[in-house]
Swiss-Prot record:
InterPro entries: PSI_Ycf3_assembly, TPR-like_helical_dom_sf, TPR_rpt, Ycf3/AcsC/BcsC/TPR_MFPF
Intervals holding TPR repeats: 35-68, 72-105, 120-153
CC terms in the record's Gene Ontology section: chloroplast thylakoid membrane
Protein name: Photosystem I assembly protein Ycf3
Provenance organism: Phaseolus vulgaris (Kidney bean)
Lineage of source species: Eukaryota, Viridiplantae, Streptophyta, Embryophyta, Tracheophyta
Task performed by this protein: Essential for the assembly of the photosystem I (PSI) complex. May act as a chaperone-like factor to guide the assembly of the PSI subunits.
Cited PROSITE patterns: TPR (PS50005), TPR_REGION (PS50293)
UniProt-annotated location(s): Plastid, Chloroplast thylakoid membrane
Keywords in alphabetical order: Chloroplast, Membrane, Photosynthesis, Plastid, Repeat, Thylakoid, TPR repeat
Length: 168
């Protein structure tokens, strides 16, 4: 049974109903509809922590989806799963790929910054301040891009940039 038919929580049900209505009234190809169904099922599985199932759905959505903008969100969600699994190198790769298709994803820049900041903290714990500084500088650049896209967001990042002298 497709995941879209077994959603149990109110928000998932509401999203599924609205999505199904939109799929019926908006002119789309059958491939686009199938891609969206896989994407929606991937989001549902991801929200329940079923990452393997979510990835299968996202990969199938990627195979079917041709629109770069829509593909950017699929890639972003794949990046989220890899981040959750601690696979930071893979996550960064997917965030980069998402941004290639849609450079207006502040959440991708933010997540990349968080990973770089985390790696900077790891380097400090390992006693390598030079490597840490490099990671922190990279985090700063990504946070600046996220903040430029959504100036009212990422207040903690803005504060970190100011405290560390990286805010221009």
């Amino acid at each position: 049974m497709p995941r879209s038919r077994i959603n149990e929580n109110f928000i998932d049900k509401t999203f599924s109903i609205v999505a199904n209505i939109l799929l019926r009234i908006i002119p789309t190809t059958s491939g686009e509809k199938r891609a969206f169904t896989y994407y929606r099922d991937g989001m549902s599985a991801q929200s329940e922590g079923n990452y393997a199932e979510a990835l299968q759905n996202y990969y199938e959505a990627m195979r079917l989806e041709i629109d770069p903008y829509d593909r950017s969100y699929i890639l972003y969600n794949i990046g989220l799963i890899h981040t959750s699994n601690g696979e930071h190198t893979k996550a960064l790769e997917y965030y980069f790929r998402a941004l290639e298709r849609n450079p207006f994803l502040p959440q991708a820049f933010n997540n990349m910054a968080v990973i770089c900041h985390y790696r900077g903290e790891q380097a400090i714990r390992q006693g390598d301040s030079e490597v840490a500084e490099s990671w922190f500088n990279q985090a700063a650049e990504y946070w600046k891009q996220a903040i430029a896209l959504t100036p009212g967001n990422y207040i903690a990042a803005q504060n970190w940039l100011k405290i560390t002298g990286r805010f221009e």
